[in-house]
A protein has these predicted regions:
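Active-site segments that bind and position negatively charged phosphate/pyrophosphate groups
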Residues: 1-118
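C-terminal charged capping/lid subdomain of soluble metabolic enzymes
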Residues: 99-177
Length: 177
């Protein structure tokens, strides 16, 4: 978990620099380093991956002209809000405290919600990414079929912190409008 947190902190630090200074070698090099570690499988340590947003976003990219990163930036905060509950709370508290540096003495739900808000602000404000599916011209026309496809990739539901059935996925898409 700490390795993943370090990768996120690296991205949160260097992402805005790379956007403001596209020729900044240090920022680009650190983002490439972080990306290599994020994708090579080492941080999962052979265990199941809880990143439920990827199959949901793959459907966005299959149906619409949207890059994977933009789709992830839009969906991730909505997925986080949807799966936040008493069972997942400590994961979000760890994320808020260890990645965003939030005060661990705050109420746990306050930490979790603030971490989600900071994540959305990072994507939308710091990286100037679209904030919603509406911002990129997507409506709810294909949500039902996209949700079924996303869930079928994993045998009928997306496994993760919270298992997501097609109806859950539709709700996340709708929240992202």
């Amino acid at each position: 978990a700490r390795f993943a947190e370090a990768i996120l902190k690296t991205c949160f630090h260097y992402g805005p620099i790379a956007c403001k200074e596209p020729d900044n070698y240090e920022a680009r090099a650190n983002l490439m380093w972080a990306s290599s570690w994020a994708i090579n499988g080492l941080i999962s340590g052979g265990s199941a991956n809880n990143w439920s947003v990827h199959p949901m976003e793959h459907e966005l990219s299959a149906y619409y002209d949207v890059t994977h990163g933009v789709g992830l930036a839009i969906l991730t905060p909505h997925w986080m809000r949807y799966v936040l509950n008493d069972e997942t709370l400590d994961n979000f508290v760890d994320y808020g405290v260890n990645v965003w540096g939030l005060d661990p003495s705050l109420d746990k739900y306050e930490i979790a919600n603030k971490a989600i808000d900071l994540t959305q602000d990072f994507f939308c404000k710091d990286l100037n990414m679209p904030a919603s599916l509406t911002d990129i011209g997507i409506d709810d026309e294909n949500f039902e079929v996209m949700a079924k496809h996303a869930a079928n990739v994993k045998g009928g539901s997306i496994q993760g912190f919270v298992n997501l059935k097609p109806e859950d996925i539709v709700k996340i898409y709708q929240a992202a409008l």
